[in-house]
């Protein structure tokens, strides 16, 4: 497994297009359960918000974003990794960064995203609840997770 040297930094305004593309590519690779209409609607919502959101980025040696995380207090609202960099420790690096700052970190994951559920469980997250609908009332069940050291 290739583990290229990645570092972390806070996002800056010029990162907007790159993080939006990471989100789109990651969703295309992992969220095949979304209907086409919902995928389009969610894309529009994310495109309005994500480029200016205060993110933590994982960047490669050329300072190109390869993944990002959005923290909101003690909750991780988002974690997305460019498909070409999955399995290289990028997501783990971002989550460990958050856990070092926020013991008991919580996050939510789509129930249908088995890969993400397994990833979080391997890092010590446990289910603490479930919602039948996502945050926008769409029929995509959410598992609520909390890190238990």
Sequence positions of predicted segments:
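Conserved beta-hairpin
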Residues: 54-67
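Conserved acetyl-CoA-binding loop-helix of GNAT-fold acetyltransferases
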Residues: 87-100, 118, 122
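Conserved acetyl-CoA-binding loop of GNAT-fold acetyltransferases
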Residues: 121-130
């Amino acid at each position: 497994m290739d583990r290229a040297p990645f570092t972390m930094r806070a996002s800056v305004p010029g990162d907007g297009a790159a993080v939006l593309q990471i989100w789109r590519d990651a969703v295309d690779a992992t969220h095949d359960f979304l209907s086409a209409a919902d995928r389009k609607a969610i894309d529009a919502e994310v495109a309005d918000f994500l480029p200016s959101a205060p993110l933590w980025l994982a960047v490669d040696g050329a300072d190109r974003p390869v993944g990002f995380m959005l923290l909101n207090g003690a909750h991780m609202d988002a974690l997305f990794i460019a498909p070409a960099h999955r399995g290289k420790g990028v997501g783990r690096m971002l989550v460990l960064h958050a856990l070092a700052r926020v013991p008991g970190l919580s996050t939510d994951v789509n129930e249908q995203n088995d890969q993400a559920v397994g990833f979080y469980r391997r890092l010590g997250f446990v289910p603490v609840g479930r919602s039948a609908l996502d945050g926008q009332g769409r029929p995509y069940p959410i598992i609520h997770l909390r890190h238990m050291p």
